[in-house]
Amino acid sequence: MEKRMKELVDKLNQYAKEYYTEDNPSVSDAEYDKLYRELVTLEAEHPELVQADSPTHRVGGLVLDGFEKYQHEYPLYSLQDAFSREELDAFDKRVKSEFPNADYMAELKIDGLSISLTYVDGILQVGATRGDGSVGENITENVKRISDIPLKLDQPLNITVRGECYLPRAEFERINTQRQENGEAEFANPRNAAAGTLRQLDTKVVAERRLATFFYQEASPTERLTQNDVLNEVAELGFSVNPRRIVTSSMDEIWDFIQAVGQDRDHLAYDIDGVVIKVNSLAIQEELGFTVKAPRWAIAYKFPAEEKEAKLLSVDWQVGRTGVVTPTANLTPVQLAGTTVSRATLHNVDYITEKDIRIGDTVIVYKAGDIIPAVLRVVESKRTTQEAMPVPSQCPSCGSGLLHFEDEVALRCINPSCPAQIKEGLIHFASRDAMNISGMGPSVVEKLFKAELVKEVADIYGLNSQDFLQLEGFKEKSAEKLYAAIQASKENSAEKLLYGLGIRHVGAKVSKQLLESFGTIKELASADVQAIAAVDGLGEVIAKSIQRYFAKEEAQVLLKELESYGVNLSYLGQKVADDAILSGKTVVLTGKLEHLKRSEAKAKLEALGAKVTGSVSKKTDLVVAGSDAGSKLEKAQSLGIEVKDEAWLLDL
């Protein structure tokens, strides 16, 4: 049986390599599916024989508790940027002054997320994000769900490779269409979508989102002589490598390559934002070395933002959750960086005045950071109007008078009952970094608000499944799913609630700092300015903003309402004494608990000094196992890690 399972794993992995990496499948989808189903059946019957590189690991279904930090053995450096031919020539001159015969390899700069993969004896052991270059996050379970990443190499190598994880454009469109249908906020661009997917705690979502990769570096020591040799080796090992690259000693040829790539850029199946030029010889790379931040042997040419002319037809003034009124230009449609653009930001009223932008003007539009369409300037030679841009004096949402404070560039509505601010506040409250209510995106909030089912954030917790069935697009299953997401958000640690309240100057990081110090939102609400300002040196601007917010009667009423609905107001990871019983211990929770919710168990462990992580490793000190504990328990036992049950935790 073990022999047959190994045979199936080897065959399926080879077929997957042919399909995803080589684009040359040797078997039909039906044949692959038949073998895959056979393997699934055998693994269910013989779980003790499941192999580490089995393709069934890619399916997902595992929900992670979080991501552990990962110390990179080989640091990941940034690249020096270049924006002109002159800067490339200066780089070439610097290299050739020491190594006159050096040649270069130029390759596409994929607009994705850097990842590092480490293999031990040919088996994938760790997948990690770049992080700050020295410390990233361990995302091993997620990278296993990326179809073109080999779980096992053909050779038993100890190797670390680096690459870029990206979301193909077609997949990006599919996901955003699905999110729109589900009432969820759409991703701004493929890079953001890839980043969000890599940090998903639900591996099933990762598997469903069809991420892809291109690898470009062997970080561990290699016997290869050139960068091009490294890429050939990496490709032979089964990794995806971008075929579009050149090797030359001529900067003229590299510049021609850059121009050709720039022309093709919008027609590629993935996003790129430039071309990377590296000294091809690894020996010369070693001689040139590094600065503090970047290698001296490489440079990244960044494409300039594409610019197009469009006519400014009208301006919409939109109110954000803090009352800032932002102008958005309606334009004649233009093709820009692969998409049709008919709206672009005008930033603020001061920007309009400074650039003297008028209705009817021909303007230059570009994508800031290749993401957000923005108006850059006016083509004055094509101006046909003499009238200045009309600037509103009243809020377009509630009609209240707008203010333009001396120290601000924007108009602001200060009416707390402004419908637009309330709606935007609800969207913010439900967002991922705040209460993370899955399924409550802008379109759902709009429907709830229009149906007068919610007027403030506390109203969210008074909703039930029947309320959602009143809304267009909801069926019983989707209504129950959203209701469950709302109920689950009650158990969030209170820093997410604090951030969700939308207090000016209080972001996600500040919210956590405050709750770590004060423990509960109630304690924070009653604190004086000096006490708040003293927290990690936050200062008086933030402290006064918080005090002003909680001094209002409606804020006090809101806290009471949230508490009455069972929303947690306490920080679930409070600081503990150094001599706490589990101080310094790394603990993993696994299985189903009978008496404690998982969030309660985690909070209790943290209160006793433990660091609670989502995966078992040699660094794990203790595993608390409930019923139906699976692979984590097995791994703990194989590593000789101490295992306790829920009763032990309750007795502490």
UniProtKB/Swiss-Prot annotation:
It is an enzyme of class 6 (ligase). InterPro entries: BRCT_dom (IPR001357), BRCT_dom_sf (IPR036420), DisA/LigA_HHH (IPR041663), DNA_ligase (IPR001679), DNA_ligase_AS (IPR018239), DNA_ligase_CS (IPR033136), DNAligase_adenylation (IPR013839), DNAligase_N (IPR013840). The active site is at residue 109. Residues 577-652 form the BRCT domain. NAD(+) binds at residues 29-33, 78-79, 107, 130, 164, 278, 302. Coiled coil: none annotated. It catalyses: NAD(+) + (deoxyribonucleotide)n-3'-hydroxyl + 5'-phospho-(deoxyribonucleotide)m = (deoxyribonucleotide)n+m + AMP + beta-nicotinamide D-nucleotide. GO terms for cellular component: cytosol. Its EC number is 6.5.1.2. Its cofactor is Mg(2+); Mn(2+). Zn(2+) binds at residues 395, 398, 413, 418. PROSITE patterns: BRCT, DNA_LIGASE_N1, DNA_LIGASE_N2. One of its GO terms (molecular function) is DNA ligase (NAD+) activity. Transmembrane segments: none annotated. GO terms for biological process: DNA repair; DNA replication. It comes from the Bacteria. Keywords: DNA damage, DNA repair, DNA replication, Ligase, Magnesium, Manganese, Metal-binding, NAD, Zinc. PANTHER family: CHROMOSOME TRANSMISSION FIDELITY FACTOR 18, DNA LIGASE. DNA ligase that catalyzes the formation of phosphodiester linkages between 5'-phosphoryl and 3'-hydroxyl groups in double-stranded DNA using NAD as a coenzyme and as the energy source for the reaction. It is essential for DNA replication and repair of damaged DNA. NCBIfam families: dnlj, PRK07956.1. Belongs to the NAD-dependent DNA ligase family. LigA subfamily. This is DNA ligase. The lineage of its organism: Bacteria, Bacillati, Bacillota, Bacilli, Lactobacillales.
